[in-house]
């Protein structure tokens, strides 16, 4: 009797489609968090795309402009800083909130969301909403840093009233640093004109704009100063802690999780 021939077939498993949509994709901590999350999910078998109105995110992960985003009933939607029309129907809708007062959830109809993700306990307590929610910290980049010992300090983040950039400059110069590099975009021109421009004009501060390469940015400074009025997580502090960079500012005391831990928290939420 001839042996019976059997053929094994592998049935491909369709990847779950995740679409991250934000109304802000200029440089910043929130945009970096979304880029890192997109790459993390794609590395672990999801089909994830990050959509937004600006161009900065487009070459850093699987991404597209927001007008290319088509949502359907099989999609998992993660939305940030944007109100999605109620008539949009998806498999699951998660609100990813990085903000406090600029996006107060008590003023938003939260019934359309299946869950809400905060980045820290203090932020969740500030928002104080009675809805299903999780706390998932963002990925913190691990940066190699060598102290240039150059008497130059850095201030990282947008230049605006909330960041209190002028106080960071004043503290750094008062501590003996010769110059302060400002890595960030001017988001508040009146604030800049009234409080920061004088430091730039005197040569004590230099507008260094946003730097895409974190190792190049941190490698130019001997310390980092931070004076923000409100932080939900504190990504700059966390990056400095992991790299051993002197950080001068109020601590958020935030947990820093490994990528695998962060992925597992999202995996539990998406399924």
Each language-model region and where it sits:
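N-terminal pre-catalytic "stem/leader" segment of glycosyltransferase-like enzymes
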Residues: 1-73
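Extended catalytic core of nucleotide-activated donor transferases of GT-like folds
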Residues: 4-6, 57-114, 118
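Conserved donor-binding/catalytic core segment of Leloir-type glycosyltransferases
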Residues: 19, 140-163, 169-175, 180-181
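Glycosyltransferase donor-sugar binding loop
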Residues: 52-56, 179-193
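Donor nucleotide-sugar binding/catalytic pocket of nucleotide-sugar-dependent glycosyltransferases
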Residues: 112-144
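Nucleotide-activated donor-binding/catalytic signature segment of Leloir-type glycosyltransferases, i.e.
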Residues: 193-211
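Short alpha-helical donor nucleotide-sugar binding micro-motif in glycosyltransferases
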Residues: 210-211, 216-221
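Aromatic "clamp/platform" in nucleotide-sugar-dependent glycosyltransferases that forms part
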Residues: 229
């Amino acid at each position: 009797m001839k042996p019976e021939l059997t053929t094994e077939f592998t049935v491909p498993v369709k990847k779950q489609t995740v679409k991250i949509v934000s109304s802000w994709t200029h440089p910043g901590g929130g945009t970096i968090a979304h880029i890192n999350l997109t790459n993390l999910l794609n590395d672990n078998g999801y089909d994830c795309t990050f959509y937004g109105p600006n161009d900065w995110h487009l070459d850093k992960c699987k991404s597209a402009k927001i007008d290319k985003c088509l949502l359907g009933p099989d999609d998992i939607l993660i939305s940030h800083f944007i109100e999605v029309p109620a008539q949009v129907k998806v498999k699951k809708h998660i609100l990813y909130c990085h903000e406090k007062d600029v996006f107060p959830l008590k003023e938003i109809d939260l019934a359309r969301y299946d869950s809400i993700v905060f980045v820290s306990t203090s932020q969740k307590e500030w928002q104080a909403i009675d809805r299903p929610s999780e706390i998932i910290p963002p990925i913190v980049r691990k940066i190699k840093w060598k102290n240039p010992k150059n008497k130059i300090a850095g201030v990282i983040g947008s230049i605006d009233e909330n960041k209190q950039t002028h106080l960071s400059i004043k503290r750094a110069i008062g501590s003996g640093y010769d110059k302060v590099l400002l890595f960030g975009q001017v988001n508040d021109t009146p604030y800049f004109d009234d409080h920061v421009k004088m430091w730039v004009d005197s040569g004590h501060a230099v507008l260094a704009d946003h730097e895409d390469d974190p190792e190049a940015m941190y490698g130019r400074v001997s310390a980092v100063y931070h004076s923000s009025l409100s932080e939900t997580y504190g990504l700059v502090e966390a990056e400095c802690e992991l790299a051993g960079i002197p950080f001068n500012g109020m601590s958020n005391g935030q947990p820093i999780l490994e990528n695998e831990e962060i992925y597992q928290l999202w995996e539990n939420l998406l399924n």
